[in-house]
């Protein structure tokens, strides 16, 4: 949705997160709340489709969206996806590889700057010059950063890369005859996190196939199948990190640069004088665990349209859409144990553990949505007059359910399953929701030679 920024008049797009897979924008029209999104005539979600599948996008404001009822109070975004055409088969392939990076970088203070600040704090509190926390010789050692007792570790460079790659590939085929038209699409998108390698990724796959055909002279039928699967895989990183939202504040800026990146014994994790041990531990899936969320969405749409031979311009149409969603979250947190090292004595000392104990949480969710639309459409021009009308009945039935379980105190995190945790710490929960809505819609348009116009709309909803 963030790609719509600057593309449509009156549409305000605000990206609230840069995390791969969560970089969708909040949209509003003329500064109001979130608009209603209609995809191919049915309410939908922009995050479920790939930009390459979109044929056109338009906006309805004010009274022009009244046919969609109270839900259109903040405006309507109309999206039409691509379909087949009366042409020879055409195959299109598009690919792109981009690099994403920060436009502005705020780096944490290094050891030298921290020491200066501590001296300033001491002196501003009425301290004595000769008893400042750090002498000039020590400040110089921090600046050089070569003495193991006066390190100047750059935690930012250790875990953040300048650019994170993103790739997008899609292939489509379009074709058909006057009688039958078809369209197929497959797209793949991958984004990597800006943290150093082995810190996770986001993958998304989109598939679509549709066709329409004239069964008889006045009868046209068709179907459209869309499938989307995505996988959000991030480091767990403890209670400060979670799914990535608090990383910058909780990890980078609280790490102490006076501690080393790693220890001579590579099997041990270096301490960084912070609540959750070390940024090196937090961003590495092998060390801290992972937050892995998989979503599957499949949408089937079928329609039949019949043009009356008795009333010119009158068509009857039935449109049925069925959507199935499923999600599975596996959130494995591995507790970190951290050490310090005294080079002179060649001694390793236990420094602490990450706050959260080792745990595993699994969430399962499913949802279905059935939409049925039955309509009569009338459209005719005669002697400078244009008359069009719509009468529609629409019903929506939605079911959702989910459950989760969590267990803690793993004796070993080698086995990443519930059975390896302490059964006495297990907690479970579940929930479900069901709702439905029926709507009756009517619209009448009349104009005479595009000079005089009348439009009337009526809609009733019950839930």
Kindly give the residue locations of the regions a language model identified.
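Residues embedded in well-ordered regular secondary structure
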Residues: 7-10, 17-25, 35, 76, ...
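Short beta-turn/strand-loop junction motif enriched in small, turn-promoting residues
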Residues: 13, 42-44, 62-65, 80-82, ...
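Extracytoplasmic loops and strand-loop junctions of Gram-negative outer membrane beta-barrel proteins
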Residues: 39-40, 60-62, 151-157, 191-194, ...
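Flexible loop and strand-edge segments within Gram-negative outer membrane beta-barrel domains
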Residues: 102, 147-187, 191-198, 206-279, ...
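Surface-exposed loop/turn segments flanking beta-strands in extracellular/periplasmic regions
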Residues: 113-151, 242-279, 334-356, 399-428
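Outer-membrane beta-barrel transmembrane strands
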Residues: 161-178, 186-187, 277-331, 359-381, ...
């Amino acid at each position: 949705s963030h790609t719509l920024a600057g593309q449509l008049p009156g549409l305000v797009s605000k990206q609230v997160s840069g995390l791969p897979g969560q970089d969708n924008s909040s949209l509003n029209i003329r500064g109001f709340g979130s608009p209603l999104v209609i995809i191919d005539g049915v309410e939908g979600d922009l995050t479920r489709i790939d930009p390459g599948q979109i044929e056109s996008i338009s906006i309805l404001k004010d009274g022009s969206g009244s046919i969609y009822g109270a839900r259109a109070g903040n405006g309507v975004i109309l999206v039409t996806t691509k379909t087949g055409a009366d042409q020879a088969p055409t195959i299109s392939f598009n690919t792109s590889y981009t690099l994403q990076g920060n436009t502005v970088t705020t780096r944490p203070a290094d050891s030298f700057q921290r020491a200066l600040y501590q001296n300033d704090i001491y002196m501003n509190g009425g301290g004595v010059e000769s008893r400042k926390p750090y002498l000039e010789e020590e400040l110089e050692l921090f600046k050089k950063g070569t003495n193991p007792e006066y390190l100047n570790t750059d935690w930012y460079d250790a875990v953040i890369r300048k650019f994170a790659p993103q790739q997008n590939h899609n292939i489509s085929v379009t074709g058909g005859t006057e009688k039958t038209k078809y369209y197929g699409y497959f797209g793949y998108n991958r984004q990597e996190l800006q943290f150093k390698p082995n810190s996770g990724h986001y993958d998304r796959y989109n598939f679509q196939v549709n066709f329409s055909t004239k069964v008889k002279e006045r009868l046209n039928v068709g179907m459209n199948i869309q499938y989307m699967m995505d996988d959000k895989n991030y480091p767990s990183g403890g209670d400060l990190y979670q799914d990535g939202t608090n990383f910058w504040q909780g990890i980078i800026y609280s790490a102490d640069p006076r501690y080393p990146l790693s220890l001579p014994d590579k099997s041990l994790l270096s301490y960084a004088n912070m609540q959750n041990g070390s940024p090196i531990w937090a961003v590495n899936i092998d060390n801290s665990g992972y937050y892995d969320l998989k979503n599957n969405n499949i949408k089937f749409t079928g329609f039949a349209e019949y043009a009356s031979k008795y009333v010119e311009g009158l068509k009857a149409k039935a449109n049925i859409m069925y959507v199935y969603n499923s999600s599975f979250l596996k959130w494995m947190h591995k507790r970190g144990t951290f050490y310090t090292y005294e080079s002179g004595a060649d001694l390793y000392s236990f420094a602490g553990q990450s706050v959260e104990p080792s745990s595993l949480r699994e969430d399962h969710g499913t949802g279905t949505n059935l939409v049925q639309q039955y309509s009569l459409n009338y459209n005719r021009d005669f002697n400078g007059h244009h008359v069009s009308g719509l009468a529609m009945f629409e019903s929506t039935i939605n079911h959702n359910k989910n459950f989760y379980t969590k267990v803690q105190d793993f004796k070993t995190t080698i086995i990443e399953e519930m059975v390896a945790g302490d059964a006495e710490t297990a907690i479970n929960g579940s929930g479900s929701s069901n709702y439905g809505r029926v709507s009756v819609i009517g619209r009448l348009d009349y104009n005479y030679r595009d000079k005089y116009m009348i439009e009337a709309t009526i809609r009733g909803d019950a839930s």
